[in-house]
Amino acid sequence: MKSLGEFIIEKQAEYPQAKGSLSGILSAVRRAAKIINRDINRAGVVSDLVLGSMGRENVQGETQMKLDVFAHEAMKAAFYSRDDIAGFASEEEEEFTAFDTERGHNAKYIILMDPLDGSSNIDVNVSVGSIFSIYHRVTPIGTPVTLEDFLQPGHKQIAAGYIIYGSSTMLVFTTGNGVNGFTYDPSLGTFLLSHENIKIPKDGAIYSINEGGYLKFPQGIKKYIKYCQEDAPEEHRPYKSRYIGSLVADFHRNMLKGGVYMYPQASNYPNGKLRLSYECNPMAFIAEQAGGVATTGHERILDIQPQALHQRTPFIVGSEHMVNKIKDFIAQYPDN
């Protein structure tokens, strides 16, 4: 079975212009994933150190968990060690970080990341994940990066991926040429290629949404949920409702089995809740590379021009036929 390192070296030939830089960044992600995986696996043993709240909120207004901070620092250290990264932005910090050194000024790439998605699930041993996104900077080489570098539409990503920490730990990523998954073998300390050229089934029978917010959803989403619940055996309905509360875990299951994930706008979240740059863009890039679709319900996610670092958006992603059906319902039942 091919290791992640071997895979990266093999694929490096596809990006001669990168001169190994992209491969090096993915290696940094791999290193950070191992550190985060170790801390998560020890969570129940050293609970006072890694479980629970930091007693403060992050920029999103969410309670910051200890493991959020550990994961953030692990990713930050891994990226700072690279000569080819000019700066990064994290869901956990209000402002982006420019690596204000000569090597940082001369670096070509910037990173956006959600260090630990679903961290509130840690203390009940539910799967969580890390999400990352890589872009070419747009400001001149030799200068510090600016906000402009981080406010790029998702279709300009050159790589994106996630790590899911569950019954096994997997790194799934794309560089714009399909999606591949690597499972961590702790006995070897190595990620091994276990899921090659992943494709999302065109249709599925799983819908994932927090139905506790049903009364606050748009009419089109309400109608689609009822459609999923209808008894129509000839169309393989009712569908299964599966919602973990960790975007990475829900997305990962649906990508492998076929399904759709929804986090629409709601009366209490009129612009949606998920972050465009840290969560939606990387997952949308992965989904499209695997043959899926990602939309707000009205617009392709990867076409949105971000206006702010922590901009939120409605998010619907998954199997092509299911997402298109939701778009039909949204168009048919507009909210006036």
Swiss-Prot record:
Substrate binds at residues 117-120, 210, 243, 273. Pfam families: FBPase (PF00316), FBPase_C (PF18913). Mg(2+) 1 binds at residues 91, 114, 116. The keyword DNA-binding does not apply. Binds 2 magnesium ions per subunit. Its cofactor is Mg(2+). GO terms for molecular function: fructose 1,6-bisphosphate 1-phosphatase activity; magnesium ion binding. It is found in: Cytoplasm. Coiled coil: none annotated. Disulfide bonds: none annotated. Belongs to the FBPase class 1 family. Homotetramer. This is Fructose-1,6-bisphosphatase class 1. It comes from Dichelobacter nodosus (strain VCS1703A).
